[in-house]
């Protein structure tokens, strides 16, 4: 069984990411990393808080938060800088 799983947070509803995270922990994964860029950052934060406070209270803790910036190709081939976040959740 894998000890770490990465979930990329994007355009789907927040509940999809919450369910994926809870299922990973129920399958025996010890650490889940939520990664998001741009507008999805707030969705990743909401996912982490919902898992910690509502779905697995007392069992999961937010271990680390990394704030990053990624360079991506924008329209017209120009390079843009986009904010990114990595939230590490671990079983307590």
Curated annotation (Swiss-Prot):
Keyword set includes Acetylation: yes
Disulfide pattern: none
GO CC annotation: chromosome; cytoplasm
Modifications made to the protein after synthesis: Acetylated. Acetylation at Lys-11 decreases DNA-binding affinity.
Organism superkingdom: Archaea
Chief place where the protein resides: cytoplasm
GO biological process, one term: chromosome condensation
Annotated InterPro entries: Alba-like_dom_sf (IPR036882), DNA/RNA-bd_Alba (IPR013795), DNA/RNA-bd_Alba-like (IPR002775)
Modified sites of kind N6-acetyllysine: 11
Subcellular localization: Cytoplasm; Chromosome
The entry's keywords: Acetylation, Chromosome, Cytoplasm, DNA condensation, DNA-binding
One term of GO molecular function: double-stranded DNA binding
Function: Binds double-stranded DNA tightly but without sequence specificity. Involved in DNA compaction.
Similarity comment: family membership: Belongs to the histone-like Alba family.
Protein name: DNA/RNA-binding protein Alba
Organism: Pyrobaculum islandicum (strain DSM 4184 / JCM 9189 / GEO3)
Gene: albA
């Amino acid at each position: 069984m894998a000890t770490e799983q990465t979930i990329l947070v994007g355009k789907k509803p927040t509940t999809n990411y919450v369910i994926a995270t809870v299922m990973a922990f129920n399958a025996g994964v010890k650490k889940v990393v939520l990664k998001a860029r741009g507008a999805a950052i707030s969705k990743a934060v909401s996912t982490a808080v919902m898992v910690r406070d509502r779905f697995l209270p007392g069992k999961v803790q937010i271990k680390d938060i990394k704030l990053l910036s990624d360079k991506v190709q924008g329209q017209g081939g120009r390079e843009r800088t986009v904010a990114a976040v990595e939230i590490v959740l671990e079983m307590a």
